[in-house]
Amino acid sequence: MASRSAQQVGTLEWWQQGGKWFSYEGHAIFSRMAGQGEPLILLHGFPTASWDWHRMWPMLTQQYNVLVLDMLGFGFSDKPVPYDYSIEDQADLFEGWISGLGLKTVHLFAHDYGCSVTQELLAREQEGTLPFRIASICFLNGALFPEVHHPLLIQKLLCSPLGGLISRGLSRRTFERNFRRLLGPANPPDRQDMDDFWQLLTYNNGRGILHHLIHFMEERRCHRNRWVGALQKATQPMRLVSGVADPVSGAAMARRYRELVPNADVVSLRNVGHYPHFESPWDVFSAYREFRKQQ
C-alpha cells in the first residue's frame, strides 16, 4: 500500500485530490495550499493550470506557505459559457481569495498569463485599493511588454473570427505540436506529461473556451500603459527569470525588461523555453531562493 501511494505522489490525480474548491461568483475554483512560512502565491499561465508548478511544489513548500489556484476557465476550475473572461476579473478572483484568507502581506510568483494578472494587482496596490501588501514579485516568461510578444500562429488564429471553430476543433496532435514549440531542448515533456496537459485543457469542456480566454492578448495592448507603468513605479523587489529559448516571450522580452524597468534584475536560463518551472525546476527554484535571500 505504501509503495502504491508513493507512486501516486506527483501525479495529476494526486494534485487534484490534494486540492480544495471554493466559490467565486457562483463558480467552483480549485486551489491548493501547503507549507509553512511567509505566504507565496503562484499564478499560472495560458492555456494550462496550477499543475505547471507541481515539479517545484516540494521545493517551495519546504520554505514557504504556498498557495495556488486554477483561474476561472482553467484546469480543474469551472469553465462557464457564456462568460466575460478578462485579466481584471482574474485579478478580482485573486484579490478576493487572498483577502478572504486574511493574508495581509504576500509574495507573488507568476508565469505567462499570471504575469498580466500580477501587473493588474500591482497597479491596484499603487492606487491604494488592494487590501493586502505585495512584498515581492518574481516573473517567469511573461508577455510583460506586448510590443515584443511573438504569438504562435495557433494563438493568432484563436484571436481571429475563426477562433471558435479553431478552439472547438483543436486536436490533441495540434495541441502537442504547438506546445512543444514553446519548449527548449533541455528537458522535453514525455507522453505522460502531454497526457496531463491535454487532460487539464479538455476538462469541463475547456477546449471550447480557448478563443474567449485568449482575449488577454488584446487586453495587454489596451492596458499597456497601466501595466508597464506599474512595473516602472514598483518599489518592492522584483526579478524576471527568463527561459531564453522561448520563441514567444523569451530573450526579446528579457531585453525589453532591462530597457524599461529601473534596476532590472534578470536571470536568464539557456536552453530553457516558455515553461522554466516545468522544464528546469531546480534552476528556477535556485534563482527564486537567491532572490528571496537578498531581501
Regions found by a protein language model. Name each.
Residues 1-40, 61-64, 103-104, 286-295:
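Alpha/beta-hydrolase fold catalytic core
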Residues 30-76:
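Conserved HGGG/HGGXW glycine-rich cap/lid loop of the alpha/beta-hydrolase fold
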Residues 104-149:
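Conserved hydrolase catalytic core segment
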Residues 146-199:
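Helix-rich cap/lid subdomain of alpha/beta-hydrolase
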Residues 263-295:
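Catalytic active-site module of serine/aspartate enzymes centered on a nucleophile-bearing elbow/loop
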